């Protein structure tokens, strides 16, 4: 059966679009990287900050870089829901060994509220000593985040250099994906500024929203409702046995 070329871009909490190409059968890892780079480049102007492939024959979603992505997982849930005509869907994703259970609530033609449950997701939190700021490594397996509690340095050259320095210092260069997530506490709320590098496709984005970064911030602070750079909320729950992630989603191109 030939691979299709159905493509959509789906945003999470008004940002961080995921470009998804629906294919019938899996690719090699090298092909995921090659085609994923092209897909990402072709859809960046449409709001995509990452790209992946929905393998319809295997109920699987694979990121171009093989990493785990929380926003892309919920974007994939929207696509699986549309393809199956079902509100509740289960599937697997790259960077996570368990099963994703998703509930997709359609609000309008292009708008949805999506909740994903990742049963068995391991969330390791490891304090980093020797810095003025409070820093924790949060390891989700398919992506690792360095959570820095300080004001976000808005200048691109500064946050790029900080990301590079922490990635080297903490020996994270060989991980599939590395995020540095600045968190700012405002009264009882927490806002994040996520900067994410994906090794195999060498992409680097100050993401306009970040699902896995939300999980990391929740794990460190205990706060569930995390304010994204868009000003919108993504909600996370980190339990000993599972992680949940939920927010508004919107199909911005198909």
Annotated model-derived regions:
Residues 132-144:
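Short, cationic low-complexity segments
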Residues 116-118:
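Internal, conserved structured core segments that host functional sites
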Residues 1-113, 122-130, 146-254:
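A glycine-rich beta-to-alpha transition motif near the start of alpha/beta enzyme domains, typified by
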């Amino acid at each position: 059966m030939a691979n299709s070329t159905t493509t959509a871009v789906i945003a999470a909490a008004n940002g961080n679009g995921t470009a998804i190409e629906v294919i019938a059968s899996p690719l090699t890892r090298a092909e995921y990287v090659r085609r994923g780079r092209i897909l990402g480049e072709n859809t960046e102007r449409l709001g995509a900050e990452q790209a992946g492939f929905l393998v319809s024959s295997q109920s699987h979603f694979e990121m171009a870089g093989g990493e785990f992505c929380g926003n892309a997982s919920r974007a994939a849930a929207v696509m699986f829901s549309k393809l199956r005509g079902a509100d509740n869907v289960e599937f697997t994703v790259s960077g996570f060994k368990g099963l994703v259970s998703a509930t997709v609530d359609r609000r309008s033609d292009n708008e949805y509220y999506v909740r994903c449950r990742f049963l068995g997701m391991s969330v390791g939190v490891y304090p980093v000593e020797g810095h003025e700021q409070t820093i924790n490594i949060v390891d989700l397996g398919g992506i690792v985040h360095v959570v820095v509690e300080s004001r976000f340095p808005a200048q691109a050259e500064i946050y790029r250099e900080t990301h590079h320095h922490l990635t080297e210092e903490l020996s994270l260069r060989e991980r599939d994906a590395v995020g540095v997530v600045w968190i700012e506490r405002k009264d009882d709320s927490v806002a994040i500024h996520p900067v994410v590098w994906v090794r195999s496709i060498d992409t680097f984005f100050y993401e306009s929203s970040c699902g896995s970064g939300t999980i990391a911030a929740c794990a460190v602070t205990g706060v569930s409702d995390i304010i994204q750079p868009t000003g919108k909320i993504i909600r996370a729950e980190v339990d000993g046995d599972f992680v949940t992630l939920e927010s508004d989603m919107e199909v911005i191109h198909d």
